[in-house]
């Protein structure tokens, strides 16, 4: 089998990069639609006087922030020269674990473990933003 030339490899990489960009653009548009639906859901939950709707409202707010963070991650990808900054994934992880604590707080041990995971992610975020590892 003949090895591929450098120009062919670059062509393949360009095609795959364009497919990735199109997929992320499509995902971003889908997330914007879900963000709009979540806005309507939050407006409905806001005006329901029941106690259960307050939990639904808080859960909806955290989900709203998750959609928002994923959209911000996609925007940052295109603005930073097709690169995903690590700290955005850490932000999304922290928000997802906070949502898990709010929604599923059955045992104190689970909450403690989730809190330890958040602490670990915050330490990771601090390390990523330190001068030694700072890229931007």
From Swiss-Prot:
It is a multi-pass membrane protein. Keywords: Cell inner membrane, Cell membrane, Membrane, Transmembrane, Transmembrane helix. GO terms for cellular component: plasma membrane. The keyword Transmembrane helix applies. It is found in: Cell inner membrane. Its main location: membrane. The chain crosses the membrane at residues 15-35, 55-75, 83-103, 108-128. It comes from the Bacteria. InterPro entries: P_starv_induced_PsiE, P_starv_induced_PsiE-like. The keyword Transmembrane helix applies. One of its GO terms (biological process) is cellular response to phosphate starvation. PANTHER family: PROTEIN PSIE. Belongs to the PsiE family. This is Protein PsiE. It comes from Salmonella schwarzengrund (strain CVM19633).
